[in-house]
């Protein structure tokens, strides 16, 4: 746009809502409303909208919109007057002609012939006779797809049978038949637009020309768009008992015929055709009588339907594929709406200008926040224009992972004043690792009066929190070894164990926890007093740590399997304590009394604790594996039996 003083040159669009009726010839000379808006769908810049709603009858529009009237109603300055006239209306109904598979109207010819054999009769009938019932007829033991009558007699002179056939064949046709579709009301008006003493812009506007009838060029600098519902107050003639027949011998290629006479024609042939052939065969009717009867029906069916309101309709399209008829209507248009858009830019047709607000971004700020929270970005906007501005701010696109609120914020800002706008920004990432992300978000500010826009971008930064499933473990490869990580709180992962040597991470505890084991083994737990595994001194053998199950219970992470493992291990400890303390305690007891001054109960206690611990550890290695659990239960039964056997008192009789 070109700046003129403190104003902006712009486009101007005049919007006229027109109403027509058929009962008077008064001219419309003024508009009811005039407003000044931004932009149009056809030209850049501002829009001058003039609306007219008539409350009286009129068949002609002759509007004069003076420069002073434009200024008084909008505050904008126009350098020329604007006039618009609409006249010379023509209204009609357009009826499309549609091919729907209707049969043609045929003429008919009777045929008969005598044959020596049935085969000769059959061949002649199937090659020459017409099918008018879509049923066929039986000839001997065969059924034809055509209609015919036949008779036979014995010729004593030749000593053989003779055969005679009677049938009808089509003898030309009058034309193809089409349905008449629902009508479209078409209007045609002449438009003339002029700014000052410049060359007028003219156009013919009609809703019957498809796209060009909806939006037409009104010269080089203006466009006219019809957008209302056409209503004349009169319905077009109804199509009730009409069809159309197409042929070169009809004026314009089409003729309107009666649907009832057409149906009577075909119903008579289908229902009475075979009866007529039988009458001919029996000698009751002659060939000429039947031909005259059928062709009379055909002639009547193709006659012009003079009683129809479309009998004298003008042919708009003579082709069979897209035929159309035109019926003139006497009434005038009522309530059509028209938009007139006039270019008033730097090189436009009319010049209009108006002081407007002018936004300028004087400061901005970004945001830094964590993933589970949000931040706010903001701008300060100053009105550096000569009039109050209505400034609308909106947050635009952001970098990947960042989203800004889509809400638009509008404020009225006086000249020289500043307004602040802020928008909420959030962050979303699918990453599982903790990291920082940076990006930018755009903010655009528009003066709704002029359409002028200014924009900027601000920085945003967010910290990604590590994410994981609480209680679940994962395995990663590091330096060729499996490293087990756990998720204690659902937000971050931490290192749990490293599987070295031949050990690999395998699932245990219902597939939510891992353990370092040799390939091909399952179950288990490792590291520290409550680690999942511990290593035997000297031998270096790694064993599952029973105390790990107690850790799961104390931490609240135990499941049903953990409880069962602890219960079985505890029973094994009690059984081992009792068995070793009683059975082996007696042996060690004897040795101790010779070399160690300790009471028997102390020795049994120590031996029982050591034995119970070793048996409990061995049992835990088994119960961490489902198959081992079954073997362990059987072992406990055997151990219980041995315990009872060893502790049973001897009874001497």
Curated annotation (Swiss-Prot):
Organism: Haloplanus natans (strain DSM 17983 / JCM 14081 / CGMCC 1.8972 / RE-101)
Region Fusion loop: start-end pairs: 155-160
Keyword line: Calcium, Cell membrane, Disulfide bond, Membrane, Metal-binding, Signal, Transmembrane, Transmembrane helix
Chief location of this protein within or outside the cell: other
Function: Exhibits fusogenic activity. Mediates cell-cell fusion in mammalian cells (bilateral fusion).
Location relative to the cell: Cell surface; Cell membrane
Topology, Cytoplasmic side: 581-604, 647-653
HAMAP family, A to Z: Fusexin_1
Name of this protein: Fusexin 1
Family per record: Belongs to the HAP2/GCS1 family. Fusexin 1 subfamily.
Membrane topology summary: Multi-pass membrane protein
Subunit structure: Homotrimer stabilized by interdomain contacts and numerous Ca(2+) and Na(+) ions.
Cysteines engaged in disulfide bonds, as pairs: 129-167, 398-441, 468-487, 499-516
Topology Extracellular: residue spans: 25-559
Domain notes: The extracellular N-terminus has 4 domains; the first 3 are structurally similar to fusogens from plants, C.elegans and viruses, while the fourth domain is unique to archaea. Domains I and II are discontinuous. The fusion loop in domain II is stabilized by a Ca(2+) ion so that it protrudes from the molecule.
Origin: domain of life: Archaea
Higher taxonomy: Archaea, Methanobacteriati, Methanobacteriota, Stenosarchaea group, Halobacteria
TM ranges: 560-580, 605-625, 626-646
Signal peptide: 1-24
Annotated GO CC locations: cell surface; plasma membrane
């Amino acid at each position: 746009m070109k700046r003129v003083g403190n104003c902006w040159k712009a486009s101007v669009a005049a919007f006229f809502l027109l109403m027509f009726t058929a009962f008077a010839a008064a001219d419309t000379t003024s508009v009811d409303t005039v407003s000044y808006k931004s932009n149009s769908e056809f030209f850049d810049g501002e829009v001058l909208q003039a609306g007219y709603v008539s409350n009286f009858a009129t068949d002609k529009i002759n509007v004069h919109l003076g420069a002073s009237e434009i200024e008084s109603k909008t505050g904008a300055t126009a350098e020329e007057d604007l006039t618009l006239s609409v006249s010379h209306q023509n209204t009609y109904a357009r009826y499309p002609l549609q091919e729907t598979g209707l049969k043609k109207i045929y003429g008919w010819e009777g045929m008969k012939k005598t044959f020596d054999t049935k085969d000769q009769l059959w061949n002649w009938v199937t090659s020459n006779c017409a099918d008018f019932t879509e049923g066929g007829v039986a000839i001997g033991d065969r059924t034809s797809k055509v209609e015919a009558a036949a008779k036979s007699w014995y010729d004593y002179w030749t000593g053989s049978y003779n055969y005679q056939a009677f049938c009808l064949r089509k003898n030309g046709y009058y034309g193809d038949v089409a349905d008449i579709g629902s009508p479209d009301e078409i209007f045609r008006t002449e438009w003339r637009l002029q700014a000052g003493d410049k060359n007028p812009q003219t156009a013919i506007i009609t809703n019957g020309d498809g796209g060009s009838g909806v939006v037409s060029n009104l010269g080089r600098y203006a466009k006219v768009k019809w957008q209302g519902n056409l209503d004349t107050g009169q319905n077009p003639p109804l199509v009730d008992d009409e069809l159309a027949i197409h042929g070169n011998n009809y004026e314009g290629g089409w003729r309107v015929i009666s649907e009832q006479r057409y149906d009577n024609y075909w119903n008579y042939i289908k229902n009475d055709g075979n009866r007529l052939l039988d009458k001919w065969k029996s000698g009751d009717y002659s060939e000429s009588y039947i031909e005259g009867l059928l062709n009379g029906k055909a002639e009547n069916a193709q006659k012009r339907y003079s009683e129809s309101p479309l009998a004298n309709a003008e042919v708009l399209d003579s082709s069979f594929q897209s035929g159309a008829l035109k019926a003139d209507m006497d009434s005038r248009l009522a309530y059509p709406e028209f938009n007139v858009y006039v270019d008033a830019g730097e090189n436009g047709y009319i010049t209009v200008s108006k002081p407007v607000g002018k936004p300028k971004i004087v400061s901005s700020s970004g945001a830094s926040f964590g993933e589970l929270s949000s931040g706010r970005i903001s701008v300060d906007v100053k009105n550096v224009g000569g009039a109050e501005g209505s400034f609308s701010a909106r947050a635009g696109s952001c970098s990947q992972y960042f989203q800004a609120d889509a809400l638009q914020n509008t404020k009225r800002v006086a000249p020289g004043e500043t307004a602040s706008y802020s928008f909420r920004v959030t962050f979303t990432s699918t990453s599982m690792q903790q990291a920082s992300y940076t990006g930018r978000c755009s903010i655009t500010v528009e003066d709704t009066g002029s359409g002028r826009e200014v924009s900027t971008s601000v920085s945003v930064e967010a910290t990604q929190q590590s994410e994981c499933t609480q209680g679940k473990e994962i395995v990663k490869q590091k330096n060729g070894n499996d490293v087990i990580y756990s998720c204690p709180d659902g937000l971050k992962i931490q290192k749990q164990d490293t599987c070295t040597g031949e050990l690999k991470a395998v699932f245990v505890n219902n597939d939510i926890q891992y353990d370092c084991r040799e390939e091909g083994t399952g179950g288990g737990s490792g590291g520290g007093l409550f680690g999942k595994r511990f290593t035997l001194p000297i031998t270096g053998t790694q064993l599952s740590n029973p105390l790990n199950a107690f850790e799961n219970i104390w931490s609240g992470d135990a499941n049903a399997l953990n409880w069962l493992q602890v219960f079985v291990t505890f029973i094994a400890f009690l059984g081992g304590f009792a068995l070793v303390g009683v059975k082996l305690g007696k042996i060690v007891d004897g040795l101790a009394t010779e070399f160690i001054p300790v009471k028997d109960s102390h020795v049994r206690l120590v031996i029982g604790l050591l034995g119970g611990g070793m048996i409990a550890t061995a049992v835990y290695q088994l119960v961490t594996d489902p198959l081992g659990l079954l073997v362990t239960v059987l072992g406990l039964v055997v151990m219980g039996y041995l315990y009872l056997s060893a502790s049973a008192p001897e009874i001497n009789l």
